[in-house]
Structures are given as C-alpha cells and as structure tokens.
Regions:
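Short internal beta-strands
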Residues: 106-114, 273-275
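Short, well-ordered amphipathic alpha-helices
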Residues: 47-70, 93-96, 119-126, 205-212, ...
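Active-site flanking residues adjacent to catalytic metal/cofactor-binding acidic residues
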Residues: 40, 86, 190-193, 226, ...
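Short mixed-charge
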Residues: 63-72, 128-147, 253-267
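Cap/insert and terminal regions of metallo-dependent hydrolase folds
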Residues: 197-309
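Di-metal (Zn2+ and/or Mg2+/Mn2+) metal-binding site signature of metallo-dependent hydrolases
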Residues: 63-104
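Metallo-beta-lactamase
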Residues: 112-176, 299-314
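Core dinuclear metal-dependent hydrolase active-site scaffold
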Residues: 2-78, 144-217, 313-316
Length: 316
C-alpha cells in the first residue's frame, strides 16, 4: 500500500497514557501543505509543542510568528484551530485545562458525554475556572462547546479538514470516540481509548471498520491511530484498553472486513500509529520496546507500525 505523495502531517505532542504527566495523549494533524491544525485530544499541549519545536517538527511556522521568542504560545493560540476530545479522562484533557489561561477563543468538539463531564467536573469554578460556554456562571466563553452528532461529518472552521465521529466504548459504562479526519479526499482515523469488541456487548470497533473499509480499498485512508496500552494483560485488568494481543485481533478482524478473500493482503503497508503506550514504573522505559518486540512478532498483516516519540513529525 504505497502512495505517490503524503496527505497529512502529524505533530506528536504526547503519546503516552501515563504515568508521566508531561507526555500525555495529544496529536496535531493538518493537511501536508498547511500549518492550520486540529488537536486530537489534549493531554499535553505546551510541553509537547516545546519539544516538537525544538526537534524542528514545525515546518515554516517560525517565519509566521512576529516574535520568535514566543513561538510556542503562538502555535498554541494561532495554529491550533480546534480541539477534538475523544473522552474526558485526565490524560486526554490535562493540557487543555492547564493551558487554558494562555489560549484564545476556539471550539471544543466532543460527543455529549465528554462535554458534560468537562462542564460538570473540570470547567466548573471548583476544579478550574469555567473558560467554556456552558455550566456554572460566570461563563468566560473562551472555549465554545460543539456537541457532535455521531457519524455526522462536520467541517472544521479555519481549516481544510472535516471530521466524522464514531462511538467507542472505553468500558461497559463509559463512552469514547473515534474521529475520521478528511482533507481533499484523503483520510486519517484516530481512535480514542477503546475496549476490545470481544469484551463489549456491542461491536463498536467492527462498526467503525465496516464504515471505513472502502477507504482502505480505495487507498484513500492514509493511516490509523490506535491504542496499545500494554504488552500483555489479563482481560480483567485491561480496564477498557487494548494490549498487543487484543489490538492484533481487532486488526485481523478489520482485515477480513476489507478483503474477505485475502485478509493477509488487506492492510499490507498501512501505517498504524501506536498511541497511549503506558509506562511501567517497574520496567522503566522498556515498556515501549517490549510492545515493539511483540508487535513485530505478531504482525502477520504487513502493517507498518509506527511507535512515535513526543515531538515527532509524521507524514501520512
């Protein structure tokens, strides 16, 4: 699955599911020729922008800023056009809350449950001032909540992208979201935290797979962001996440949807960015390498797995 040119750029602001608080889930995405981004989750913002800028991952942005000494706040305020929050757990919204005092007016897009949790439990004048457009007064209206309708595509203001949300389950009683990002006929799919279908009463991941299978068949899907929180966990200890075994099971099932006759060929060369890798205080930095080793061992689909580092720039 090769392409003549790349369609998207991704800046990795945070790729971990913890426990370190300065590298939490957040990815900026924009068309390859544009620096007008949306944020897919917002666990780390300014700390990730700082690392990415020092790595040289932002192409051409320094020339746009009138003050090179303030480049990171400029990127946060002026180049991040909107936030798409998959769910309201702290490792996906911490940067949004903490950095709100440095931000400017823009929308937060999320499904109803995520917005309700942000409104009632974070931006509420008890945990944090209410910088948003609903909830406990006074409303500061820095962030405007935009409630997403499932599977309805919306166009993102001040960007060249549209986004279509799909429902996921982070556990039996907690909703999460997948976002299908589109620009000029090309797509990238971002999964928020998700439980494997085998442990859920409804097949949420299968539903997403059926909807996007034609995009793989037409080679217009440029990449998938998919969590792999652990190397290996007992099912009772997954807590609404995927480990390598369950992630590969979902990908094999997806391959069968894309190409029932030759599933082993269906996803060959597809870029899958591994996200939400959780650190282990006992194993130190080896957790990520153990995931990499196990993915290499189990990858019988020819997928191009990408295990990002904070601050990386990835082209899809």
């Amino acid at each position: 699955m090769s392409f003549s040119k790349e369609a998207f750029q991704v800046i990795v602001l945070g790729c971990s599911g913890g426990p370190k608080e300065d590298n939490l889930s957040s990815y900026l995405i924009a068309p390859i020729h544009s620096n007008d981004f949306i944020a897919l989750d917002a666990g780390s913002l300014l700390s990730g922008i700082d690392k990415a800028y020092k790595k040289g991952s932002f192409k051409g942005i320094s020339e746009e800023s009138s003050n090179p000494w303030q480049i990171e706040p400029y990127i946060l305020r002026d180049k991040v056009k909107a936030y798409f929050i998959s769910h309201a757990h702290l490792d996906h919204v911490l940067g949004l809350v903490i950095n709100s005092t440095e931000d400017i007016k823009k929308p937060i897009f999320a499904i109803d449950s995520a917005i309700d949790f942000l409104r009632d439990h974070l931006f509420n004048w008890k945990i944090w001032p209410n910088f948003a457009s609903e909830g406990n007064p006074p409303l500061l209206n820095l962030y405007e909540y935009q409630r997403l309708e499932l599977e309805r595509k919306i166009f993102v203001p001040n960007t060249e992208m549209s986004v279509q949300p799909f429902l996921l389950s982070h556990s039996r009683n907690y909703e999460s979201t997948a976002f299908l990002v589109e620009s000029k006929g090309f797509y990238a799919l971002y999964f928020g935290d998700t439980a494997p279908d085998i442990l859920e009463p409804r097949k949420y991941m299968e539903n997403v797979g059926k909807k996007i299978a034609p995009l793989v068949q037409s080679r217009s899907l440029r990449g998938i962001f998919l969590e792999c929180s652990y190397v290996d966990k007992e099912e009772s200890q997954l807590f609404g996440h995927l480990d390598v075994k369950h992630m590969m099971r979902e990908l094999r099932h997806f391959a069968c949807i894309v190409n029932p006759i030759s599933p082993q060929e269906a996803l060959k060369g597809l870029k899958v960015i591994i996200i939400h890798m959780k650190g282990d205080s006992l194993k130190g930095d080896f957790s990520k390498e153990l995931i990499r080793i196990e993915l290499d061992r189990q990858n019988d689909l020819g997928i191009e797995f990408i295990l990002p580092e904070q601050g990386d720039r990835i082209e899809l």
